[in-house]
Amino acid sequence: MRVAIEVADWVAVCFNAAVTETYRIPDKRRHPGMGRLGPDLCESNTDPSVAVNLLLSHKVGADQLGEVLLDQRVVRGLGNLYRSEVLWATELSPFARIDSLTERDAIRLINAATTMLRANMQRAECAASVAGKGGLAVYGRNGQRCQRCGETIDCRPFGQHGRMLYWCRGCQQHHDPHQEMQTENMPIDPHPAAQAYLAGLPWNRNVS
């Protein structure tokens, strides 16, 4: 199923949606879950401490950090690309259990996400806190060297929806549970929207 939301200046397209739901703003009872959305880090009036508290109080402590960051009830606005970039910037393992995080970890993570998202709202190309080609540190760079430690960047489908996760085993070891994990030898994120984005990155363009 494909869903498109169109306004005067933008069109947002969702590919391969397993389930879609709609609701009317005047009557949120049609979709009571909308009342439980977390704070949007892109909004200037958002208090980041709210997201910190929601992250630390996540109801299932054994859930992995990389999955929880995409939970809209915890935080909005992050998305798959910045999930990978923010975890790299803070040197946190995406496989860390939520109940292993300290308050300092959560504050660093949310502050990094807030800074990164707001800085990129007006940019044509996404950029992480440490800029490499295209401004990204790990997303779309599987098989390349980490610019911080020199190890090879890995990727694998991760979480309930199988979104592609990019991370560095060498320097993202904080709270890593040291579980054996198999990485996938996949050149790019298989999601259609991600394929279109990654194909346009400088190092993926065909040079004639």
Name these PLM-found stretches.
Residues 1-77, 82-89:
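Phosphate/anion-contacting hairpin/loop surfaces
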Residues 54-208:
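Basic, nucleic-acid-binding surfaces and adjacent catalytic neighborhoods in DNA/RNA-processing proteins
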